Amino acid sequence: ARGYKQGGFNLGLDATDNLVRQSLIYDPEYLTNYEFGISSNLKDRDLNYSFVIFFSERKDQQVLISRQVDPTDPNTFSYLTQNAAEGENYGIEITSNYFLRDDLYLFANLGFLKTKIKNWESRIDLEGRSQAHAPEHSYSIGGNLNLKNNLYLKLEINGKSSFYYSDSHDNQSKSYQLTNIIFGYSNSDFSADLWIRNIFNKYYSTRGFYFGNEAPNFIDTLYRRQGDPRNIGISLRYNF
């Protein structure tokens, strides 16, 4: 398969910055993807699984970078998109569902990913490094139990390994694991879910910014954006 991400303009940036003037326009990114996979049902269809191997080539890869135009003024911190020549992604995806009983099924999804930045002339120091926000390992495991009177209970555990926050610096996140639970009711016309996400209120970070913001020396410091804390809510759906 082949696809592309359209190009664009870096607007609202400081036109006095030489790098910005050279990067006002960025080109489309092109992706060529190769996949090979199998799916099957085993043991009278109690076990369903799929296995996919993929390889992707990215040409004129778009990367979001950040920089502080004036080292003494944190208000000049800006973002811009550049084309980083080439990128490479490959990995494995495994999904499975197992019906342990008529009222209980278990699921497990695993992902293994390797990425690489290639031929970025303005950042040769990143040659061969993994791309940002591309954890090598990810997984989701859990189960769904159907109770009496159209009630059900679902438990899910999601996890990711560490990943680079940005293509502008080399700081990485920590691996994390989140647990979600849903208690619900469903019939042909109506459904209601009481859900708790991140039930153990784990701290984890989703983005990281590295720049100088504190006087007098404005030493580069890592600032993290926290992921969602524990959330409790209700979802209602009605079929007309």
Locations of regions flagged by a protein language model:
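Membrane-embedded beta-barrel scaffold of Gram-negative outer-membrane proteins
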Residues: K5, I25-Y90, N97-F99, K116-K118
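Repeated loop/turn-to-beta-strand initiation elements of outer-membrane beta-barrel proteins
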Residues: D44-Y49, D103-L106, N149-L153, D189-L194
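Gram-negative outer-membrane beta-barrel transporters
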Residues: F55-E57, T76-D167, S235-N239
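Structural signature of outer-membrane beta-barrel domains
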Residues: A1-G7, D14, K43-R45, S56-D60, ...
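C-terminal beta-signal and adjacent terminal beta-strands/loops
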Residues: E57-K59, L64, L106, G159-Y164, ...
